[in-house]
Amino acid sequence: KVFERCELARTLKELGLDGYKGVSLANWLCLTKWESSYNTKATNYNPGSESTDYGIFQINSKFWCNDGKTPNAVDGCHVSCSELMENNIAKAVACAKQIVSEQGITAWVAWKSHCRDHDVSSYVEGCTL
């Protein structure tokens, strides 16, 4: 599923991400825009670590989810990677909460590149929240 911006903003807010660990909803929207273009089915393979990033948050199979094929995987969120690509993003959000709790928002390269030190207010502008 490819979310519309405001639809995703409302969904992330309902699932408790707005202000979670001090990270604003606008920052989560910026992160997901640059990681996956709001697409739950996004995947990207990383040849160096032989791992794959999954779903709207591009959660990595080396550390956080189990795809059954990544060498020396940890499965920190105790979730199958395929579950992170479901239209219902509750499991993906739960894992993102765990990641930000353990590592902070800087765990996401796209956030560091595109959102940190930027005005991210436009990501929630015009959305009825």
From Swiss-Prot:
The keyword Metal-binding does not apply. The keyword Disulfide bond applies. Belongs to the glycosyl hydrolase 22 family. It comes from Capra hircus (Goat). InterPro entries: Glyco_hydro_22, Glyco_hydro_22_CS, Glyco_hydro_22_lys, Lysozyme-like_dom_sf. It comes from the Eukaryota. GO terms for biological process: defense response to Gram-negative bacterium; defense response to Gram-positive bacterium; digestion; killing of cells of another organism. Monomer. Keywords: Antimicrobial, Bacteriolytic enzyme, Digestion, Disulfide bond, Glycosidase, Hydrolase. This is Lysozyme C-2. GO terms for molecular function: lysozyme activity. Pfam families: Lys (PF00062). Residues 1-129 form the C-type lysozyme domain. Its EC number is 3.2.1.17. Signal peptide: none annotated. Lysozymes have primarily a bacteriolytic function; those in tissues and body fluids are associated with the monocyte-macrophage system and enhance the activity of immunoagents. Lysozyme C is capable of both hydrolysis and transglycosylation; it also shows a slight esterase activity. It acts rapidly on both peptide-substituted and unsubstituted peptidoglycan, and slowly on chitin oligosaccharides. It catalyses: Hydrolysis of (1->4)-beta-linkages between N-acetylmuramic acid and N-acetyl-D-glucosamine residues in a peptidoglycan and between N-acetyl-D-glucosamine residues in chitodextrins. The lineage of its organism: Eukaryota, Metazoa, Chordata, Craniata, Vertebrata. Disulfide bonds join C6-C127, C30-C115, C65-C81, C77-C95. The active site is at E35, D53.
